[in-house]
């Protein structure tokens, strides 16, 4: 026997038993962005490597360690996309979507990062994101946060997630704070872990995000970014908080919150949970007003967020919120004998035409009554429709209930659609 080929480490199959939960999550996401009037954008999985070096930043873990990068046959450096924002900006610039226009966009699809695989974190993962362009005011920041809060409400997990909020100010304010933070870190350099020492000059704000307990202890006396904000940035953050208060979205201001990507300014946020251990962040985003120009477009304000679907699915499973996921089949049609096969197929086809939302599975491959009922039960269907020679002669179908103790009954062929519509509504 030939050796079986396995999936690549960190790249998982989503099996038929798992896909209904994924479909439920995806349906909630699509319905939520539709309620806010957002439009879908789809971008290639493979992009020029320079796109991510220029947007994410060359001195980041993603670019330095995690990207899947290769040369094609022309010698061009290409990369499997590690996130969706840069591709969305590239597409917007390329197709003239962002020039003096407002755009509310969303995307969903696979991303790739060469990280250490663990529960809720994979090398191929599925990301859902929202991006808004052309609006610089705090009300749109509030809107994307309201949209994200709606997701949790519709998924039934609002009580299990918390919003953390911060502001990074504008580039000039952040530059002044950066110098003050570097000066502070230099005084404690010998106590910093290796990763923080490496980031101290290239990306010092990321030191604030260190998980090292000793570094966090040192940072207790570090200068605060809030003290370096100008009036405009302070007012933007104050207005955002006022709007969130007005609509009843609770949050916690976290002055240590920074984002792992270089392009963020002003508003940054994360939704976190205590239910997933170390994988606590379930959605993150913020404002990135400089990225469109950085990638060759005109100065354009922008704000958005992204979430990993694997982590959302894991959270729903951890909280045992998967019980209401319906089976893939409503009705199973079985022929009791070869002479009834054509009639059974016709019944199934008619039901699919008259009841488009009814999920009908036909038994194929023959077999005795016991085998067919076993397959019907395994399909998850509510009922099996049995068609034998007697049913054929009388113009009826026998309805056998699979999920309760109701006695089976006969239903006239011409009344079957109405009967099933009432039964499965």
Curated annotation (Swiss-Prot):
Gene Ontology cellular-component terms for this entry are: cytoplasm
Q: Which UniProt keywords are listed?
A: Aminoacyl-tRNA synthetase, ATP-binding, Cytoplasm, Ligase, Nucleotide-binding, Protein biosynthesis
Q: Does the keyword Protein biosynthesis apply?
A: yes
Q: Which reaction does it catalyse?
A: tRNA(His) + L-histidine + ATP = L-histidyl-tRNA(His) + AMP + diphosphate + H(+)
Q: Does the keyword Transport apply?
A: no
Q: Which InterPro entries match?
A: aa-tRNA-synth_II, aa-tRNA-synth_II/BPL/LPL, Anticodon-bd, Anticodon-bd_dom_sf, His-tRNA-ligase, HisRS-like_core, HisRS/HisZ, HisRS_anticodon
Q: Where in the cell is it found?
A: Cytoplasm
Q: Name one GO biological process term.
A: histidyl-tRNA aminoacylation
Q: What is its EC number?
A: 6.1.1.21
Cite the record's note on assembly: Homodimer.
The name this protein goes by in its record: Histidine--tRNA ligase
Can you name the source organism?
Shewanella sp. (strain MR-7)
Q: Which gene encodes it?
A: hisS
């Amino acid at each position: 026997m030939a050796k079986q080929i396995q999936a690549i480490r960190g790249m998982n199959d989503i099996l038929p038993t798992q896909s209904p939960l994924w479909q439920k999550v995806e349906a909630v996401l699509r319905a939520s962005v539709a309620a806010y009037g957002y439009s879908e954008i789809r971008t290639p999985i493979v992009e020029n490597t320079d796109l991510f070096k220029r947007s994410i930043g060359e001195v980041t873990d993603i670019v330095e360690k995690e990207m899947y990068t290769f040369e094609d046959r022309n010698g061009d450096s290409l990369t499997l996309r590690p996130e969706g924002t840069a591709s969305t900006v590239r597409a917007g610039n390329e197709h003239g979507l962002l020039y003096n226009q407002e755009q509310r966009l969303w995307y969903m699809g696979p991303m790739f990062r060469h990280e250490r695989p663990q529960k809720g974190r994979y090398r191929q993962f599925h990301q859902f994101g929202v991006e808004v362009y052309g609006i610089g005011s705090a009300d749109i920041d509030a809107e994307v946060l309201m949209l994200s809060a709606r997701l949790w409400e519709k998924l039934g997990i609002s009580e299990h997630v918390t919003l953390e909020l911060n502001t990074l100010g504008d580039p000039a304010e952040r530059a002044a704070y950066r110098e003050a933070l570097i000066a502070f870190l230099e005084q404690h350099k010998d106590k910093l872990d290796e990763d923080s020492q490496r980031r101290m000059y290239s990306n010092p704000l990321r030191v604030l995000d260190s998980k090292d307990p000793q570094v966090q202890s040192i940072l207790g006396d570090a200068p605060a970014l809030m003290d370096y904000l100008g009036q405009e940035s302070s007012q933007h953050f104050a207005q955002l908080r006022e709007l969130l208060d007005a609509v009843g979205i609770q949050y916690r201001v976290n002055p240590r919150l920074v984002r792992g990507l270089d392009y963020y300014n002003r508003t940054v946020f994360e939704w976190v949970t205590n239910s997933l251990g170390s994988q606590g962040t379930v959605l993150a985003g913020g404002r990135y007003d400089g990225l469109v120009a950085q990638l060759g477009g005109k100065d354009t304000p922008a704000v958005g967020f992204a979430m990993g679907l694997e982590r959302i699915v894991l959270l729903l499973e951890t909280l045992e919120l998967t019980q209401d996921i319906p089976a893939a089949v409503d009705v199973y049609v079985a022929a009791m004998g070869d002479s009834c096969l054509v009639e059974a197929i016709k019944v199934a086809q008619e039901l699919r035409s008259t009841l488009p939302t009814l999920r009908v599975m036909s038994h194929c491959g023959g077999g005795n009554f016991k085998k067919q009922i076993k397959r019907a039960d395994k399909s998850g269907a509510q009922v099996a429709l049995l068609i034998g020679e007697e049913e054929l002669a009388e113009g009826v179908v026998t309805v056998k209930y699979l999920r309760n103790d109701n006695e089976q009954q006969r239903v006239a062929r011409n009344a079957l659609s109405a009967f099933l519509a009432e039964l499965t509504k």
